[in-house]
Amino acid sequence: DDNNIDAVIFAKTDLTLNGSGSLTIQAQAGHGVVSKDDLVVAGGNYTITAASTGLTGKDSLSISDGSFAITSGKDGLHAENADDAALGCLYIAGGSYTIRAQGDAVSASGALRVDGGTFDLTTGEGSASVTMDTGEGFDPGHRGVPGQAPAAPEEPAQTEEAETDSVSEKGLKADDSITVNGGSFTA
């Protein structure tokens, strides 16, 4: 239900956060800031810790300057409109962003445009999310004879069930175009 969004700040219509002040949000369950239409942020200092997304605009998310420290259980900056492919756009013009997201740092279902800014992005569990499975019983020294098929294993290989849900963990993600005009990125 679109009317029951758990967020510290929630608007059914457009929402604008404007000014040079500071805002600290702790959302132990749910989102930090959500607008069901356009979310516009113009300046300010934001510290957001959210179990779900940090900043979300359904129709669009537009940010002009500001300082953002976001730790989120899902996406850090998020714009998504499943009903209209022309919406869900995300625009960033300058600012400083430190984003630690379990999902994508910056995600748009439409176009994503970045015109400058400083970005320090960590997604998933950082380097700890990388795992390597060498396979039990694999002999890296055995290369076989060229031209011959490898011998069949004596025992059937064990299989693991894969999860059907996968979490996207990208720094910048868009289902449409991504345009970057300047800026500094660390991932």
PLM segments and residue spans:
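A composition-driven surface/loop motif
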Residues: 1-187
